[in-house]
């Protein structure tokens, strides 16, 4: 009988290996992951919100809107803006998008000794804000003009422009944002 038992054990092992091999060899279906993206209409909505806020405050500004990777989607430099403001606005937007946080937080971290943020390609000046939809960063806006307080306020207002409730984490009906 020991031979039969060994054969039965070997048979069970072979069946188990066969089942596992079948499972691992089955075709795998790709899962579709839907990712929100900021389209041109959405970028223009954010840009327009920033421009209108800046005009109401009589605060000429350079305004940049970027995608999550920091690539420029929309830009405007208002009249009477200092020449350096264009580059500052773009870099503030890129930093906010790539780090997925307002540049004000980065400036605060540096001011409190977190010098790791003092690296190349990080703009540690206030005025950059991520654009969030359903908690997901779909882009960012950067504003450079008169003062860091004004830049921050304009950027935060513009970042909330795609949300009907003014909250940057709210649900929207696809206005300016599409699934990719």
Annotate each PLM feature.
Residues 5, 12-27:
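Bacterial N-terminal signal peptides
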Residues 30-180:
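Flexible, solvent-exposed loop/hinge segments and secondary-structure transition points
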């Amino acid at each position: 009988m020991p031979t039969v038992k060994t054969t039965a054990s070997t048979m069970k092992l072979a069946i188990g290996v066969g089942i596992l091999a079948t499972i691992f060899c089955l075709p795998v279906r790709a899962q579709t992951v839907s990712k929100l993206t900021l389209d041109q209409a959405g970028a223009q909505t954010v840009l327009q919100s920033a421009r209108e806020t800046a005009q109401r405050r009589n605060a000429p500004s350079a305004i940049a809107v970027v995608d999550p990777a920091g690539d420029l989607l929309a830009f405007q430099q208002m009249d009477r803006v200092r020449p350096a403001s264009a580059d500052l606005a773009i870099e503030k937007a890129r930093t906010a998008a790539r780090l997925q946080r307002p540049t004000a937080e980065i400036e605060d971290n540096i001011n409190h000794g977190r010098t790791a943020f003092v690296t190349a390609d990080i703009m540690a000046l206030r005025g950059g804000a991520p654009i969030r939809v359903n908690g997901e960063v779909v882009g960012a806006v950067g504003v450079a003009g008169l003062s860091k307080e004004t830049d921050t306020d304009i950027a935060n207002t513009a970042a909330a422009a795609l949300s009907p409730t003014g909250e940057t984490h709210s649900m929207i009906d696809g206005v300016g944002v599409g699934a990719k």
